[in-house]
Amino acid sequence: MEFIDYQAFETAPDNNDKSGTNGEVSLPEPVSRLNISSFSLDYKPLKDNFKLPSILSNVETSLLQTKADVQDDTAMAQKLKKDTSNLYDRMSDYVDLSIQNFGTKNIKDSTPIPEATTRKTLVEPSSIDLEKSNEILAKKLSKVLNEYDTSYHHTIKLRKSLKILEKNRDKLGISEEKLISPDYIGTLARKSLRTDLETQLLKDHVTVLEDFKPIVRRIKRLAAPVQQIENIGEEILKNDKETFSQKYISDIDDCRNHLLKLEIKKKILKALQSKFTLNQLEDDLIENGPLKEEIFDIVDKLTKMKEHATYLLALPNSKAGEVLIKQTNITLDTINKKISNYLIDYMYTFESNSNMGTKHVIDPTERNLALFQKGLVYLSNDIQYYDDFLKRVTTMRSKTLLDEFLSQFGTTSELSTTISSSEDPVRYIGDVLATIHTMIANEVDFVKSLFKFTSEDMDKSSSMIINNNAQYFDGLDLKLVNDIVQYLANSCKLRIEQVIRFEENKVINFEITQLLDLYSSMFVNKGIRDDNPLVLHLIQLRDISEKKIINSLTKQLAETENTQISSPDLLPPQWLSDYLNSITELFDHVERLYGGKRFSKDDIDSDKYMFPYDTLKTVIEEPFMTSLIKQIKDSYPLAKKKEEIRIVMLTLQINCFEMINFRLQPYSLSIFSYDESCKHILENIQHTLDETVEKLQKLQISLLFERTGLNMYYNLMNMIFPIDSIQDEIDYDMYMSLVDNPLMSLENLEKNIHEKLNDYLPQALPDFQDNLLIKLTSPSIADDVCEICFRTLTDFYCIFRRILKHLYPDNKEKVEAILNFTESEFKTLAGV
C-alpha cells in the first residue's frame, strides 16, 4: 500500500471520465516525495500547543511560496533523516520545521487577518473531499486484493502473514493509527513497514545461506579433484578400445604397490606421530592453559613417550632417540614447573584466606584439593621440584606458626594474648606449652588434610606413582609437621629457660619438670619425633630444672657444712629439719604424680623418674651417712676420751637419725622401693640408728654397773664364761676358779658392792629416766634403752647372787647379807 498517497486525492475526479477499465475512475499518479534534506537542523522545536496561523492573505501566495521552498526542504529532510531513528519522529520534526519555515517566509505583519469563512476554507477539508478520497482508496484496495491469487492456499498464507504481523505488532513497533493515517505520515509509515519486513526477510535468507557456506566451500574444494577424476575417466573411456601393453600393466602394478607402501608408511608415520608427539591443543595447554586433569594425561603420555624413546636408542643411529628424550625431558620440566607453581599458589591462597580470618580447615571433598594432591603426586617424579616445594611449604608454615606464637606475648590491649606475664612461673610455662600444643594440633590437622593420602584414594595412574615413590609419601604429613614445628623450638626454649634460670623454689622447679615431661609426651603423641629439636629442648629444660632442684638441695647442705650442731638440749639442728621438709615435700609431689604411696621401677618411666639411686645417694645417703655423722663427731672432739661426752654425742646422733628415719620411713614403699639400691639407703639409715642406740645401751649399762659397784665383777665373769650363755646350775661350775681370786672374797665383795648398791639402786631408775635418757627425743628408744639396761643389771644380779651361793655354800647368809636385795626386790627397784 506504499503507493497510496492521500494528498493525491484532494480533488474529486470528473464523473464523465470513463477512461478507466470497466468504467473505473482513472486514478492520478502519486506525487513524488518531498526532498527534506535541505532543511537545517538549527531550529527551536515548536511548542505542543502550536496552531496554524490564520493570517494568510490569500491561498495563491501561500502555494507559490511553498513551491519555492521545496528544494531547500528536501535537503533539510535528508539531513534530519540521518539524525532521527524513528520514522514517525522524523516526520514530526519535518512537519514542525516545514511549518516554522513556512511561517517565517510568508507571514507578514501587515497581512490582514482573513475572515472565518476564508480560514475554514483553507484549513479544514470539506466532508465531500474526505468521502471522495475514501472512495478512491477503497477502489484501489479492491483492485489490489482482486489481483491477488484467491486460491485457498494463498488465502491461508495471507491470513497467516497478517496474524504474524498482528502477533509481532509490539516487537516490530507497528502503529495502526500511523498505517491508516490518510496523510503523508501514513504513507511513510507503510513504506517503513515494508522496508522493515523486507530487511528482516533478507536477514532470514542470509542466515539460511550461511548454513550453505561450508557446503559450497567443500564443493569448490572438491571441484578440481572431481574434475581431474572426470577428465581421467573420459581419457580412459577414450582409450578403452586400445590394447594395453604388458609394460603399461607392469607400470600400473608398480604404481599400485608404491601407493600401498606409501599408505603403509603414512600409517606408520601417523602412529609414530601419535605416539611420540603432542598435538597442537596439548602444546597450547602446556604453555598457556591452567592446571587441570588434562595436564596429568599429557604427563602420562610424555612418560610413555620417554619409555618408548629408549627403544630408539638401540637403533644404529640413536640420535633420534636422544633428541626425543631430550625434548620430552624439557616438556616434562615445563609441566613440573607449572605444577609446582600451582601448588605454591594454592598454599599462598590458603595463607591469605587464613590471614583474613576465613575458614582455616580445607574441605577434603573440595575439587581443588583433589587437584592439589594429584599435582603433588605427579611432582614427586621430579625430586628437585618436589623438595623445593616441600621446603617452601615448611618455610611458609613455620613463619606463620612463629608469628602466631610470638603474638601471644604482646602487651597492648588490642592484642588478644593468652600469655601476658610470668608472675606465676608454673602457669606461665603451662600457658606457653599449651599454646604450642594447640598450634601443633591445628597444624597436624591442616597438614593431614593436604598431605595425608594413600594410593586407594587416587586414580590408577596416581596410585602407580605413589607405589613407585613410596619413600616420598610414607609419613609425609608427620615429616612436614616435624619440619615446621622445629622452628618453634628456640623461641619456646628461650621463653621457658629464662623462668627456670631465676627460679629457686624446689617445689616450683619440680612442677615445672612435670609440666615439661607431660607436654613432651603430648607432643610425641601428636606425631612429633623424639629427636625433634622442640622435644629435645623440652628434655634439656627438664634436666636443667631437675639439676636446679638437686643443686638447691646440695647448696642448702653446703651452707651448714661447717656449723656446730651441738646444743644443750641435744635436739637435731634446725637446718636438718628444714632440709627434711624440702625433701619430703618433693617426695609427696612424686607420690601424687604416680598415683599413690606404693610404686616400683616397673610402674614408671625410668628416664623421667627424678629420684633414682644416684639422686638419692646425693641428697640422702651422702648428707646423712657421711656429712651429718662427721659434723656430730667434730662437735664433740673429747667423746673418745670421756664416756659422758660420748653418751651426749650418741644421744644427739640418735635424735638426728631417729628424726631422719621417722620422716623418710613413710616413703619406704614408694621412693625407696624404686630398686634395691634405693631400699639399701633407707636400710642403712635404720641400721645406723640401731647401731647408735646399741652403743648408747652399752655405755649406759657400763655406767649403771659402775654406779652399783658390779662393773668389775660383770667384766670378770664374762671373761670366764658369758653370763648370757648360762642355762642351768651346772654352768655355775665354770666360775669355781674365782674362789681363789682375792676380788671374789666375801670381804672384798662387801667392801666393793654392798654400800654402792644400797645407795644407788633405789634411785637408779629415776636417775636414768630423768637425767641420762631425758634428752632422747624418742620415748620408745628411751624406754628400750632403760629397759635393756636394767634388765641386764637385774639378770646379772640374780645370776651373780646364785653363783656366789654356789661358790660359798657354807656362807650363804653372808652372801645374802652382802647382796641383801632379794631377786624380787631387786626387780621391783629396777622396774623390770
UniProtKB/Swiss-Prot annotation:
Cystine crosslinks: none
GO biological process, one term: intra-Golgi vesicle-mediated transport
A Pfam family that the UniProt record links to this protein: COG6_N
Primary location class: Golgi
Protein family membership: Belongs to the COG6 family.
PANTHER family: COMPONENT OF OLIGOMERIC GOLGI COMPLEX 6, CONSERVED OLIGOMERIC GOLGI COMPLEX SUBUNIT 6
Protein's name according to its UniProt entry: Conserved oligomeric Golgi complex subunit 6
Organism in which the protein naturally occurs: Candida glabrata (strain ATCC 2001 / BCRC 20586 / JCM 3761 / NBRC 0622 / NRRL Y-65 / CBS 138)
Lineage: Eukaryota, Fungi, Dikarya, Ascomycota, Saccharomycotina
